[in-house]
């Protein structure tokens, strides 16, 4: 049954169950909705139910949608049935700018079924319910909540703050290893074709919502603002990036690259040897880390919005784009290029990363 505030509920395309579009709707649906959702998703038996919501709080952050952390109780405790939950909504009904990114989560929801198959090679938060309504762009995802700093899991690390993270190179090695395992498993054909076929190659889809390209006048204003910022805060940027020569070249190159956006996307899509299913935004803040008895650092990944087949240069850049400049170069050289043989493969990986970076940032620079 649709909730009491109908504009906050939609009927899902996958299960045909009405689900809330935001935290207000979820709170109104309460334990009844959670019971129905977990049953229809197959994680809760008909003889079991959600009996209590012990914790319910909104979580700030992220570029799209609203988020909730919850703790629930069940009538019967069952192994593998999680009580600490994290809820993601694609919509932000109170913020039109954030709501524009609502399409980002559709692949995330479709990814739920694939992530549960035994052949899936890396750790992801276990999905207890996921559905979407394509027509309105409304999606909902309920997963286990990863408790950072508890039971062997390291604390949460923020992107762009590598200097606060112990052994950053080891962490990026673990992160890139996870990406490589997923890409390799997909290309080997070990994942169910019926599920991977739901993620066709679409280079243009790897972005947060629909961002309108900047006009030449607006782009020129951005460059002027950037130059003023560099002049005012020179210590915040590496010396070579803040030099007048670099800024002049940037002002000349970015419009030219943006003009060839479709050519760049075509080149990324055409290089079939480097295409695979992968995480598009595997920054360090979308990962969690732990060590096993072998003392090897392991990595799990969350926030699978825009997941799909892509050029691996895009995936690697998505993982490294928040790293310190020197760490980015070191991690790519150590973990990607020095492991490639022959050298032509290493060169191709570097080229793909550069093209992926250009295609991501030059068409719609922040």
Question: What do these predicted regions represent?
Answer:
Residues 59-60, 135, 171, 270, ...:
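Secondary-structure capping and boundary motifs in well-ordered enzyme cores
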Residues 45, 86, 142-158, 252-258, ...:
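Active-site-adjacent bridging/hinge elements
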Residues 207-209, 274-276, 283-322:
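Catalytic activation segment of kinase domains across protein kinase-like and atypical kinase folds
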Residues 1-140, 259-262, 266, 290-299:
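Conserved NTP-binding catalytic cores of kinases and kinase-like/nucleotidyltransferase enzymes
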């Amino acid at each position: 049954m649709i909730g009491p505030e109908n504009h906050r509920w939609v009927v899902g395309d996958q299960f045909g169950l009405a689900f809330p579009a935001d935290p207000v709707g979820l709170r109104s649906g309460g334990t009844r909705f959670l019971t129905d959702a977990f049953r229809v998703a197959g994680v809760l038996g008909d003889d079991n139910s959600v009996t209590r919501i012990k914790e319910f709080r909104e979580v700030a952050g992220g570029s799209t949608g609203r988020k909730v952390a919850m703790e629930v109780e069940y009538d019967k405790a069952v192994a593998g049935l999680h009580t600490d939950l994290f809820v993601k909504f694609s919509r932000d009904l109170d913020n039109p700018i954030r709501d524009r990114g609502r399409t980002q989560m559709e692949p995330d929801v479709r990814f739920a079924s694939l992530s549960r198959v035994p052949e899936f090679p890396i750790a992801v938060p276990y999905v207890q319910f996921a559905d979407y309504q394509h027509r309105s762009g409304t999606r909902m995802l309920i997963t286990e909540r990863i408790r950072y700093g508890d039971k062997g899991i390291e604390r949460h690390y923020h992107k762009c703050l590598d200097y606060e993270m112990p052994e950053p190179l080891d962490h990026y090695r673990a992160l890139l290893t996870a990406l490589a395992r997923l890409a390799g498993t997909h290309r080997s054909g070990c994942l169910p074709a019926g599920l991977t076929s739901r993620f066709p190659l679409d280079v243009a889809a790897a972005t947060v919502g629909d961002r309108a390209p900047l006009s030449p006048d607006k782009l020129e204003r951005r460059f002027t603002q950037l130059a003023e910022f560099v002049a005012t805060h020179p210590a915040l940027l590496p010396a070579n990036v803040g030099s007048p020569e670099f800024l002049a070249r940037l002002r000349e190159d970015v419009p030219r690259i943006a003009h060839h956006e479709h050519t760049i996307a075509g080149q990324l899509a055409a290089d079939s040897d480097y295409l695979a299913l992968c995480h598009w935004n595997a920054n360090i803040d979308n990962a969690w880390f732990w060590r096993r008895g072998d003392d090897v650092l392991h990595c799990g990944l969350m926030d699978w919005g825009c997941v799909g087949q892509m050029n691996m240069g895009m995936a690697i850049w998505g993982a490294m784009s928040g790293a310190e400049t020197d760490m980015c170069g070191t991690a790519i050289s150590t973990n990607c290029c020095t492991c490639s043989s022959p050298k032509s493969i290493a060169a191709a990986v570097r080229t793909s990363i550069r093209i992926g970076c250009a295609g991501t940032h030059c068409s719609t620079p922040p």
